[in-house]
């Protein structure tokens, strides 16, 4: 029993690094470093134990061909072929990854070889693969493997032989016009194949295909260039907003744009669309969490569908139209289940195709997700219902929205304005606003929307009554009423007399006495400002302690990528405009206090030594320590003096003259000039040299084994 317990405990043992990885994944399910640890651990475990990890992996990254391949290879290794085929059924059609498809072909080749129908199944597998992944730039090996497979098929009789030749030729001809790496080699193999069958017929066959091949070869080079730098094995993760990610997104979009530019210069719109959609599919394997890629892919299919319909190709037009809907469906069913943007675009697309029932199902599907804010969904749903089925249908959606506890005040504003603009009945809109005020009277945004509506109707008395009700009812907390008071003051400034303006100002100051104590003048600014015009300069506003409540709030709610309006007005005075120059970071500076007689190897200024770069640190660790070098040591001063006095010749003739001590003598022998064997009678002396000084300092003696001089001596003997 103790042995069994120990074995069970050992089986349940979890390494510390795996525990840390699991903890990281709880914080961030897309942490690739943590997943790498789990993958390595799973690869060292039996498949029955590792299968759970692999399932989690492909569930988290359903578009990663690399992870699917790891899972499948683990099952193949364990000879679980029934599970392998189910895995291929789950991923093969959705993940057009070249390595995954090569794995599929290898699996069919190795496991179906003994079946009687092996040849038919293998040929079908190759045709299926080339149809789906044949446009891949790295698909050369699949084409070659298919051709070699067909060549190896046994053919008995002339009819079977002709069939085999036709099949091989068909694959060669398809491949030679398909842009990919190594297309030149495929073309050379095709030429040899045709010449081996019939050398007389080969010339015509090759000439017929030569033009298309040259076009494909040109495109293949462009294809290779545009694909360079793309990280095609990266798993799809939510946008990280890093420079590296932005660069990859830009490169993917350039590749897609290149395919849209029709580099093959074909008039076949179907072929162009297929190539562009293949580019989108490759992009979505990596950028599947980016909604813009899904939307642009669907838009392109919709445009292609309309173009083909105009040309009369109704079958392909309908095919592409349905495929556009399928793109939206895939997006909201897999990686972007909560992305409202794609739901709304999908609904609008189906609305354009007059499929209203489908639109209802799309909106209801989104509303069924519990952990979302359904307010915007109801708003768009109401607008669709009003457009497609009339105002009564819109009211039914509004009723449904009111019953949903998750809904916020925006739905009431939308419903009221829809009634006002569409049914032209301001009394119904008024009732909806009043109904919403009972529920959302403590939300200043709702109150302001109601005020805007009444101002639009130019009903001064009702507007003033609403201000008084909201500000005196106590439903709105004082800290939230700042913008309401500012709007009340603006309202009185536009239509009231001076007495009413002063009265509102006084009441406002009383409400915010603690905040504006000693800053009464700051409140005066709101009386005279208009839109972005202010009665003081920016520096004066700052000195007054003025805060623009509306603009501060606007800046807070606008997302970071959008540039929010400045809280202070744009200044017109040139005096206040100060030029912005790049300035050094003075916080990082250190005082210049050099050491006296600094030891060798130390920086003269304390703290002035910068850390060695990481690459140099690695190199320094690999090098032996300084004590290992005992010499010889170079006399740097003397070496530099030799370089300084060395005269470098500008021409070959001058170099020969310096070496030989005179001009080269040429003798014509046979068919060309041959250098004469002039004997050097004295040592070569450099110009501008003083022999006496050299003797005093010690002449530079040439090395004993000077190969160059030895060769020169052999030449002149």
Swiss-Prot record:
Positions of post-translational Phosphoserine modification: 691
InterPro entries attached to this UniProt entry: HAT, Rna14-like, Suf, TPR-like_helical_dom_sf
Gene3D superfamilies: 1.25.40.1040
Classification via SMART domains: HAT
Classification via Pfam families: Suf
HAT repeats: 45-77, 79-110, 117-152, 163-196, 221-261, 271-303, 319-352, 354-387, 458-494
Keywords assigned by UniProt, alphabetized: Acetylation, mRNA processing, Nucleus, Phosphoprotein, Repeat
Subunit: Homodimer. The CSTF complex is composed of CSTF1 (50 kDa subunit), CSTF2 (64 kDa subunit) and CSTF3 (77 kDa subunit). CSTF3 directly interacts with CSTF1 and CSTF2. Interacts with FIP1L1.
Protein name as annotated: Cleavage stimulation factor subunit 3
Organism: Mus musculus (Mouse)
């Amino acid at each position: 029993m103790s042995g069994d317990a120990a074995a069970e405990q050992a089986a349940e043992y979890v390494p510390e690094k795996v525990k840390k990885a699991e903890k990281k994944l709880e914080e961030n399910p897309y942490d690739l470093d943590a997943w790498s640890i789990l993958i390595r651990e799973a690869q060292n475990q039996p498949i029955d134990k590792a299968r759970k990890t692999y399932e989690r992996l492909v569930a988290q990254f359903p578009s990663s061909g690399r992870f699917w391949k790891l899972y499948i290879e683990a099952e193949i290794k364990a000879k679980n072929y029934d599970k392998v085929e189910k895995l291929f059924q789950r991923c093969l059609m959705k993940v057009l990854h070249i390595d995954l498809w090569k794995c599929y072909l290898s699996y069919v080749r190795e496991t179906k070889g003994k079946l009687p129908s092996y040849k038919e199944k293998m040929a079908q597998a190759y045709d299926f693969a080339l149809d789906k992944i044949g446009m891949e730039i790295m698909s050369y090996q699949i084409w070659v493997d298919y051709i070699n497979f067909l060549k190896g098929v046994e053919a008995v009789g002339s009819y079977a032989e002709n069939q085999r030749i036709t099949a091989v030729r068909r694959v060669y001809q398809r491949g030679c016009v398909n842009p990919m790496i190594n297309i030149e080699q495929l073309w050379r193999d095709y030429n040899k194949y045709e010449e081996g069958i019939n050398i007389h017929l080969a010339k015509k066959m090759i000439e017929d295909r030569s033009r298309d091949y040259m076009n494909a070869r040109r495109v293949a080079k462009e294809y290779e260039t545009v694909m360079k730098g793309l990280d095609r094995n990266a798993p799809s993760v939510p946008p990280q907003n890093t420079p590296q990610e932005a660069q990859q997104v830009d490169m993917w979009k350039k590749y897609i744009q290149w395919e849209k530019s029709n580099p093959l210069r074909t008039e076949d719109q179907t072929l162009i669309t297929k190539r562009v959609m293949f580019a989108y599919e490759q992009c979505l394997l990596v950028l599947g969490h980016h909604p813009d890629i899904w939307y642009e892919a669907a838009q392109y299919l919709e445009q292609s569908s309309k173009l083909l319909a105009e040309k009369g190709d109704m079958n392909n037009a309908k095919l592409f139209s349905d495929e556009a809907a399928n793109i939206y469906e895939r997006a909201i069913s897999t990686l972007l289940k909560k992305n409202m943007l794609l739901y709304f675009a999908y609904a609008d697309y189906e609305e354009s195709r007059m499929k209203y029932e489908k639109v209802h199902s799309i909106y209801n599907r989104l509303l069924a997700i519990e952990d979302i804010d359904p307010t915007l969904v109801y708003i768009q749903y109401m607008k669709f219902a009003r457009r497609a089925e009339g105002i009564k249908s819109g009211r039914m959606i509004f009723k449904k929205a009111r019953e949903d506890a998750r809904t916020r005040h925006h739905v009431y504003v939308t419903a009221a304005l829809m009634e006002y603009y569409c049914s032209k009945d301001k009394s119904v809109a008024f009732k909806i606003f009043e109904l919403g005020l009972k529920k959302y009277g403590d939300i200043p945004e709702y109150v302001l929307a109601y005020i805007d509506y009444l101002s639009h109707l130019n009903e001064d008395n009702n507007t003033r009554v609403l201000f008084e009700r909201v500000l005196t009812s106590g439903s709105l907390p004082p800290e939230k009423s700042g913008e309401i008071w500012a709007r009340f003051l603006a309202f009185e400034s536009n239509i009231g007399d001076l007495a009413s303006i002063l009265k509102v100002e006084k009441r406002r100051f009383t409400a915010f006495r603690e905040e504006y104590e000693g800053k009464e003048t700051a409140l005066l600014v709101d009386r005279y400002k208009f839109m972005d015009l202010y009665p003081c300069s920016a520096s004066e506003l700052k000195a007054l302690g003025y805060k623009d409540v509306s603009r501060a709030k606007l800046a807070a709610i606008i997302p970071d990528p959008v540039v929010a309006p400045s809280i202070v007005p744009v200044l017109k005075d040139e005096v206040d405009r100060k030029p912005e120059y790049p300035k050094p970071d003075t916080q990082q500076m250190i005082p210049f206090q050099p050491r006296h007689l600094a030891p060798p190897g130390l920086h003269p200024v304390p703290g002035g030594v910068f850390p060695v770069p990481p690459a140099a640190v690695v190199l320094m660790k690999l090098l032996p320590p300084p004590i290992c070098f005992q010499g010889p040591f170079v006399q740097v001063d003397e070496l530099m003096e030799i370089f300084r006095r060395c005269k470098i010749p500008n021409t070959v003739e001058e170099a020969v003259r310096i070496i030989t001590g005179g001009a080269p003598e040429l003798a014509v022998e046979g068919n060309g000039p041959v250098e004469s064997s002039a004997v050097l009678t004295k040592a070569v002396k450099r110009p501008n040299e003083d022999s006496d000084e050299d003797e005093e300092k010690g002449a530079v003696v040439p090395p004993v084994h000077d190969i160059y001089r030895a060769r020169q001596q052999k030449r002149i003997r």
